[in-house]
């Protein structure tokens, strides 16, 4: 069986963590790309030298030329400028749009058949731009947002209930930003919905509301603590989970930023936004359209409209 090739475009904190995690899971050989000379080569060599200790057989290489990603099965894009304290994800549109143009051309030329996972912020509009520039089919490109946001939601719920992370399921829909929609009604502990846990006296609605808001602010909380950058361990773990679902045809149900066609989820037109999907060897194999109540639908529409607003800004910058 041919070895899988995973290309990481961007060799910063997330890129380096991705490379390490991919090796530990032996998902395939890794090529790290970056425009900064020496960085992908150095990180690649460092991680390669850890493989005898870990007992994993993965090959690592670093490059500054897009030709190195030729034939990749999966491309994970983290290239771009991260947030600093006081910035919103949306402040990065103009800078990172130019990065997506270059990355998209690199993918189109060298690995148009790859499954593409975008992690660059502002997430939803960057996925739209990357698909526009790369020409990758909509089912083969996704944004990493909901997996991370749901993981943060689950983390805070685990802390509140003092239970195992394995027993908490949570869904976050919508754009990756302040308008994201953590769905309390569809989130459970061992199959018990959160509203029932309130009735059982495990928590209060007020505490759940605080957890929902902390989830929305999860990225900013870490940015403000780090002061010099943004989160990378949890985003990398989330990206690897998505890549693994594709490479192993796991048919996992994961919330990702994907192309939601007009008419789906009550949307008037097409928009890249976070919804649950099934990821397998065909990429996004289907969208899971869960039933939303009026309040949830209104929140989701608000989130999707925020993404549309950013896409409009991006189109203006593209001329």
UniProtKB/Swiss-Prot annotation:
InterPro entries: L-lactate/malate_DH, Lactate/malate_DH_C, Lactate/malate_DH_N, Lactate_DH/Glyco_Ohase_4_C, Malate_DH_type3, NAD(P)-bd_dom_sf. GO terms for biological process: lactate metabolic process; tricarboxylic acid cycle. The keyword Oxidoreductase applies. Its EC number is 1.1.1.37. Keywords: NAD, Oxidoreductase, Tricarboxylic acid cycle. NAD(+) binds at residues 10-15, 34, 96, 119-121. SUPFAM superfamilies: LDH C-terminal domain-like (SSF56327), NAD(P)-binding Rossmann-fold domains (SSF51735). The active site is at 176 (proton acceptor). It catalyses: (S)-malate + NAD(+) = oxaloacetate + NADH + H(+). Substrate binds at residues 83, 89, 121, 152. The keyword DNA damage does not apply. PANTHER family: L-2-HYDROXYCARBOXYLATE DEHYDROGENASE (NAD(P)(+)), L-LACTATE DEHYDROGENASE. Catalyzes the reversible oxidation of malate to oxaloacetate. Belongs to the LDH/MDH superfamily. MDH type 3 family. This is Malate dehydrogenase. It comes from Paramagnetospirillum magneticum (strain ATCC 700264 / AMB-1) (Magnetospirillum magneticum). The lineage of its organism: Bacteria, Pseudomonadati, Pseudomonadota, Alphaproteobacteria, Rhodospirillales.
């Amino acid at each position: 069986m041919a070895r899988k090739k995973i290309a990481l475009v961007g060799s910063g904190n997330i890129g380096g963590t991705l490379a390490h995690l991919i090796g530990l899971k032996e998902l395939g050989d890794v090529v790290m790309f970056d425009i900064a000379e020496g960085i992908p080569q150095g990180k690649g060599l460092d991680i390669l030298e850890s493989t005898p200790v870990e007992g994993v057989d993965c090959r690592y290489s670093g490059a500054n030329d897009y030709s190195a990603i030729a034939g990749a099965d999966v491309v994970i894009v983290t290239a771009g400028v991260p947030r600093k304290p006081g910035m919103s994800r949306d402040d990065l549109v103009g800078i990172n749009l130019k990065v997506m143009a270059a990355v998209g051309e690199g993918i189109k030329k060298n690995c148009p058949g790859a499954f593409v996972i975008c992690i660059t912020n502002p997430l939803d509009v960057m996925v739209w731009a990357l698909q526009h520039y790369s020409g990758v089919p909509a089912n083969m490109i996704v944004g990493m947002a909901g997996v991370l946001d749901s993981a943060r939601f689950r983390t805070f719920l685990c802390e509140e209930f003092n239970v195992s992370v394995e027993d908490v399921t949570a869904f976050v829909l919508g754009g990756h930003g302040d308008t994201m929609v953590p769905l309390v009604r569809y989130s459970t502990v061992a199959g018990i919905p959160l509203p029932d846990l309130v009735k059982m006296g495990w928590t209060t609605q007020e505490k759940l509301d605080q957890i929902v808001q902390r989830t929305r602010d999860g990225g900013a909380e870490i940015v403000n603590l780090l002061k010099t950058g943004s989160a990378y361990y949890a985003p990398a773990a989330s990206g690897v989970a998505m890549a693994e679902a594709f490479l192993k045809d796991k048919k996992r149900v994961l919330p990702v930023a994907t192309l939601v066609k007009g008419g789906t989820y009550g949307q008037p037109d097409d928009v890249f936004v976070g919804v649950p999907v099934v990821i397998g060897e065909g990429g996004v194999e289907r969208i899971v359209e869960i039933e939303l109540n009026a309040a949830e639908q209104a929140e989701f529409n608000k989130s999707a409209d925020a993404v549309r607003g950013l896409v409009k800004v991006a189109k203006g910058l593209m001329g």
